[in-house]
């Protein structure tokens, strides 16, 4: 297992840095990418945004994020909490591997 950390992708605004990340294609389902603030998905559910989300969900690694100030908190307020690796998380959708890591939780 390997953990990589980035920040501030602001939804589709800065997704290109992940698309250009050569190492990302060589990772496995045991690896994690943590976005430390301003993940920014979902925002408006546009066709372009949905394509970006689908691309991120198709990656071999698991995308996780800690929220920043550029999040759709109204969306996340509607998502159920789930226990995951010892801490509370929320998934982007019921079937999405993308998880919001709840502030103040400790993950194993």
PLM ranges: what are they?
Residues 1-4:
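Extreme N-terminal starter segment of soluble prokaryotic enzymes
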Residues 6, 12-107:
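Core catalytic region of metal-dependent phosphoesterases/phosphodiesterases
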């Amino acid at each position: 297992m390997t953990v990589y950390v980035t920040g501030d992708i602001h939804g589709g605004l800065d997704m290109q840095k992940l698309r250009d990340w050569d190492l990302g294609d060589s990772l496995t389902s045991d690896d994690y990418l943590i976005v430390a603030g301003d993940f920014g998905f979902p925002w408006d559910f546009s066709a372009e945004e949905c394509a970006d989300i689908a691309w991120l969900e198709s990656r071999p690694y698991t995308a996780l994020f800690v929220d920043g100030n550029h999040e759709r908190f109204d969306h996340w307020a509607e998502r159920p909490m789930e226990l995951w690796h010892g801490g509370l998380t929320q998934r982007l959708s019921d079937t999405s591997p993308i998880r919001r890591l709840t502030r103040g939780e400790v993950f194993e």
